Amino acid sequence: MSQITEEQVKHVALLSKLEFSENEVKSFTDTFGKIIDMVEMLDEVDTDGVPFTMNVADNLNFMREDVAEKGLDREKLMAAVPEKEDGFIKVPAMLSDGGDA
């Protein structure tokens, strides 16, 4: 099995702004190791001569014409906003200062 360490899981959690209990760290360490083992097994499959496939489904993206349209009236929008600052909508902070991430 690939050697994924608990320190690596904790580092990824820090970068992702996630907090895990010690039991969760151990569980994720085991799970990530198994996932990497599976990917390594797939890497060993001989794909010589197999045509490149971007998508196995015949899904097509149908795009609409890009047309400029009048947006919301800024004054009406700002009148409905509970908190604003310097002409911008003020919302609660979602992330801290970033720390070591």
Curated annotation (Swiss-Prot):
Top-rank taxon: Bacteria
Annotated EC: 6.3.5.-
Presence of keyword 4Fe-4S: no
Reactions that this protein is recorded to catalyse: L-glutamyl-tRNA(Gln) + L-glutamine + ATP + H2O = L-glutaminyl-tRNA(Gln) + L-glutamate + ADP + phosphate + H(+); L-aspartyl-tRNA(Asn) + L-glutamine + ATP + H2O = L-asparaginyl-tRNA(Asn) + L-glutamate + ADP + phosphate + 2 H(+)
GO molecular function: asparaginyl-tRNA synthase (glutamine-hydrolyzing) activity; ATP binding; glutaminyl-tRNA synthase (glutamine-hydrolyzing) activity
Entry-linked InterPro entries: Asp/Glu-ADT_sf_sub_c, GatC
Keyword Cell cycle in annotation: no
Stored Pfam families: GatC
Biological process (GO), any one: glutaminyl-tRNAGln biosynthesis via transamidation
Keywords (A to Z) from UniProt: ATP-binding, Ligase, Nucleotide-binding, Protein biosynthesis
Subunit field text: Heterotrimer of A, B and C subunits.
Family: Belongs to the GatC family.
Protein function: Allows the formation of correctly charged Asn-tRNA(Asn) or Gln-tRNA(Gln) through the transamidation of misacylated Asp-tRNA(Asn) or Glu-tRNA(Gln) in organisms which lack either or both of asparaginyl-tRNA or glutaminyl-tRNA synthetases. The reaction takes place in the presence of glutamine and ATP through an activated phospho-Asp-tRNA(Asn) or phospho-Glu-tRNA(Gln).
Protein name: Aspartyl/glutamyl-tRNA(Asn/Gln) amidotransferase subunit C
Species per Swiss-Prot/TrEMBL record: Lactococcus lactis subsp. cremoris (strain SK11)
Gene that produces this protein: gatC
